[in-house]
Design a protein with these regions (language model features):
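Anion-binding alpha/beta catalytic cores of soluble intermediary-metabolism enzymes, centered on
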Residues: 1-159, 163-170
């Protein structure tokens, strides 16, 4: 009955069964309702951190923003997982991921709790030996403007403007 009467549950089941590659929702229901319906129907993958991705396409540029929907204050391990899963999502859409952990501070200046969590997340990714570029913490303007990044922070690891932004808190 739940599958037949709820379009989110029906769509989620189609994705889970391989009859659809993705689902789009939210026009008539808010995020929390949609999220609860989908996770109740199919649940998260056991090896994944549940998160939300927002994709913006503008001016011949694509930027993925994570996680702006699920984790209010993610732990460093969750931030590392979110970065890794976001990079995988970027690759699936044809982007070569350049991940920036966005914050109010830039590389620990001024010192902030979110910056400390980001520094630990970067350390976790270093230990994992992931195959994508990542750096942070940095402000959004620095992350999205590679010339500014290189001028102000020549030690930054990213080879271009970030195309994946990971938020350390909502």
């Amino acid at each position: 009955r739940m599958v037949n009467q709820n379009r989110n549950v029906f769509s989620a089941c189609m994705v889970a069964c391989g009859d659809a590659q993705a689902m789009v929702t939210g026009l008539t229901r808010g995020f929390r309702v949609s999220f609860d319906e989908v996770t109740r129907a199919i649940g998260p993958a056991t090896s994944a951190t549940v998160m939300g991705l927002t994709t913006i396409h503008a001016r011949e540029r694509t930027v993925i923003i994570a996680d702006t929907l699920v984790h209010e204050i993610p732990t460093p391990a969750q931030l590392a997982d979110i970065a890794q899963q976001s990079a995988e999502a970027a690759r699936r859409t044809g982007l070569e991921p350049r991940v920036a952990f966005v914050s109010f501070s830039n590389f620990g200046s001024p010192p902030m709790p979110s910056g400390e969590r980001v520094a630990e997340a970067v350390s976790i990714l270093d230990k994992r030996g992931v195959s994508f570029e990542y750096d942070g913490d940095m402000s959004a303007d620095v992350a999205l403007d590679h010339e500014l990044m290189k001028r102000l922070y020549p030690f930054a690891r990213l080879s271009g403007a970030a195309n994946v932004l990971v938020m350390p808190n909502l």
